[in-house]
Amino acid sequence: MQRTEKYFEQDAFRTECESVILAAEPDEKTGAGRIALDGTVFYPEGGGQPADRGTLTLPDGTVLRVLDVHEQAGVIWHTVDALPAAAAPGAAVAGCIDWDWRFDKMQQHTGEHILSGILHQMFGAENVGFHVGTEAVRMDTSVPISPEGLRQAELAANRIVWQDVPVLISYPTREELAALVYRSKKEIEGQVRIVTIPGADVCACCGTHTRTTGQVGQIKILASENYKGGVRLSVVCGARALAAAQAMRARQADIGALLSAKADQTAVAVHRIYDEYTALKFTHFGLCGQLFDALAQLTAPDADAIRTLPGLDPDGLHRLAVRLTEATTGLCAALTPTEKGTGYCLARRDGDVRALTKALNAALNGRGGGKPGICQGSCAATPEQVERFLKENNKL
């Protein structure tokens, strides 16, 4: 089968084409299929960039939705939602890509080239992983980069955008390629396509790109994390960067309204509330300790002590159970009601509560465990039901 001519490599801004079907293969299970064309504007998935979407229109007016595009041995196959009889080899079709989808991918991909090139210049970082996702671009670097280093690289990358330099596509000869310094993620056979962004990057790439860096709009690093000896970045460009800025501004406005603070004072307000929370938490810790002491003092030395208190977190349950064991050699149980049932902590000073915990979990749909002298968990029963079970089975 003849190879498919790649119109998208000749002009990434071309949105339509008139083509001839080379082959059509049905999918018997779904009724859909795939179509190979002699030439196409549809970019096939590859190099970290998703495939184009759009439509193929047959001469009789039937419109087929293009759901995915892949290249196999130089032939580009278009996965379509239906494969009528008219979609046969030799038939003409009119292709049209989803331009908004394509331009978004162009902005993300060109922005990734700019940032990758800058990171390589500044830190010697290689791009060891790249994918244009539906929400952000994921980039993995080969070396660690500090937050301040990323801030400087982001600024340098955006300066390239502001300069609005041309994005150049070239096909160097073997001799020219041997003398060229360029980035490449893998060994490439055959003709190499070089994407050059003056001042930023020279890279082997088969993807679609903007004509100038200004069309990228903006490059914004949303997040970074240490990953396999380097950093993994979450990046957005163009319209996505604008949407991210608008969303962050809206969230900041919501937070400011809740805190009765101006936008530039939300961090100060949050710190103030955090300090107040820390002080209240310390006070609460002390008051709980006093309450636990009082409950322990009301417990006879050899009696079972089953106490239910609302609002206890796991640490509070543990503290209460331990305090009760200091007052009695009997079974000690701290219980608190939860949305889904009861949180519990069982303890015995000189005994083993694991068998009792296992029985409780089995009987009351619970989960939990621990050491011989103390076990903790939760179950799908009320505190009253748990207390009744413990009184009936406390000899386990």
Residue ranges and their predicted role:
Residues 1-396:
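A glycine- and charged-residue-rich anion-binding loop/surface
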